[in-house]
């Protein structure tokens, strides 16, 4: 039997089945299709303007490494005119982040993109290892999600960025939609699939990989022989998001287009309640000056507990947005190793209860 030919060029041998479209394609046609789809996403959604300074959130994992490679490639190919730099957050997780940062440093040399590293220790006086030693593994992602989001913003502002690009892919967005449905968070459900978030703040975030499947990102990194760090965060197994991830994977196995269908459904959601129940307007934290929806930002609330020696968090999940209205902390972020840098638009209302140990 003759070898199967690529359905796109009809000349080269088909090397893989695209998870997203089920097309049998050769490597070069896969590279071209993947890059062109990301470019089309950028153009259709007007993600960037010529001359903008863009922080590419870089963890060293597959998503952020492919994002750095793609942004560097497309920026040169289509003359986006972007001033790119890599922005990494050192959470202080021994045996994980220290190793992944070495990968990011190699990426800096490979792509010729300058790197800025911001650490939890310098910003907050704590590493994640120190925090986990105080609170245990149950709610560590609560701290990390809040601190990481603020650290990315602060690092980007420090470097004069206009926007932050994160490696959130289609799987991540679908998981976020599912989580907000399960949590009954109507306001965030109405906007969690947005490709641009934080437009009401001084530093918007964009997701060029919003429609890119995680499996295709892995294939792209593999066939391009990109240098990335593949070990999962040592605290990730304790993250609640993992359950949603497994469900999305099951849906994809049964029907590959299910991921895109979930995203498209969220884009088409129209909720009357969303217009009645507005999200809090951004203001400035009274303590640190960072943008916050409450008088005191979530990072400062969490830091106060740590610094007072009362770090234990009692987490009680509630329906809707009752927790956030009370100034409580949403569980944001992705417990994950080599993936995107920075949390998706997810809220999990929790109640902060400081207890003496």
From Swiss-Prot:
Residue stretches spanning the membrane: none
Keywords, in A-Z order: Cytoplasm, RNA-binding, Transferase, tRNA processing, tRNA-binding
EC nos: 2.7.7.-
Gene: NCS6
Annotated function: Plays a central role in 2-thiolation of mcm(5)S(2)U at tRNA wobble positions of tRNA(Lys), tRNA(Glu) and tRNA(Gln). Directly binds tRNAs and probably acts by catalyzing adenylation of tRNAs, an intermediate required for 2-thiolation. It is unclear whether it acts as a sulfurtransferase that transfers sulfur from thiocarboxylated URM1 onto the uridine of tRNAs at wobble position.
UniProt-listed GO biological process terms: protein urmylation; tRNA thio-modification; tRNA wobble uridine modification
Pathway: tRNA modification; 5-methoxycarbonylmethyl-2-thiouridine-tRNA biosynthesis
One GO term describing the cellular component: cytoplasm
Cross-referenced Gene3D superfamilies: HUPs
Similarity comment: family membership: Belongs to the TtcA family. CTU1/NCS6/ATPBD3 subfamily.
Region Disordered: start-end pairs: 314-348
UniProt xrefs under Pfam families: ATP_bind_3, zn-ribbon_14
Protein name: Cytoplasmic tRNA 2-thiolation protein 1
One GO MF term: nucleotidyltransferase activity
EC primary class: transferase
Compositionally biased residues, Basic and acidic residues: 321-332
NCBIfam families to which the protein is assigned, alphabetical: TIGR00269 family protein (TIGR00269)
Subcellular locations according to the entry: Cytoplasm
């Amino acid at each position: 039997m003759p070898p199967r030919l690529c359905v796109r060029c009809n000349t080269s041998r088909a090397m893989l089945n695209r998870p997203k479209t089920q097309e049998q394609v050769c490597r070069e046609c896969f590279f071209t299709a993947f890059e062109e789809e990301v470019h089309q996403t950028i153009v259709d959604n007007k993600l960037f303007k010529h001359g903008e300074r863009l922080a590419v959130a870089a963890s060293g994992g597959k998503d952020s490494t492919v994002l750095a490679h793609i942004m560097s490639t497309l920026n040169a190919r289509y003359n986006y005119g972007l001033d790119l730099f890599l922005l990494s957050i050192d959470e202080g997780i021994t045996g994980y982040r220290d190793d992944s940062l070495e990968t990011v440093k190699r990426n800096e040399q490979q792509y010729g993109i300058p790197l800025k590293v911001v650490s939890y220790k310098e910003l907050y006086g704590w590493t994640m290892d120190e925090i986990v030693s105080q609170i245990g593994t149950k709610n560590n992602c609560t701290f990390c999600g809040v601190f990481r989001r603020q650290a990315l913003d602060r690092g980007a502002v420090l470097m004069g960025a206009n926007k932050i690009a994160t490696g959130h892919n289609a799987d991540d967005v679908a998981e976020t939609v599912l989580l907000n449905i399960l949590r009954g968070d109507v306001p965030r459900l109405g906007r969690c699939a947005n490709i641009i978030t934080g437009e009401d703040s001084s530093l918007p975030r964009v997701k060029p990989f919003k429609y890119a499947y995680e499996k295709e990102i892995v294939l792209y990194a593999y066939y391009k022989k990109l240098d990335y760090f593949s070990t999962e965060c040592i605290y990730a197994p304790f993250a609640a998001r993992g359950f949603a991830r497994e469900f999305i994977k099951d849906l994809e196995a049964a029907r590959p287009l299910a991921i895109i269908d979930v995203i498209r459904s969220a884009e088409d959601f129209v909720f009357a309640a969303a217009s009645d129940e507005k999200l809090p307007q951004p203001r400035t934290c009274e303590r640190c000056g960072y943008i916050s929806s409450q008088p005191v930002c979530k990072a400062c609330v969490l830091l106060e507990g740590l610094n007072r020696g009362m770090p234990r968090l009692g987490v009680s999940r509630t329906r809707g947005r009752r927790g956030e209205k009370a100034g409580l902390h949403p569980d944001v972020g992705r417990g994950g190793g080599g993936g995107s840098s920075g949390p998706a638009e997810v809220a999990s209302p929790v109640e902060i209860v400081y207890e003496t140990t």
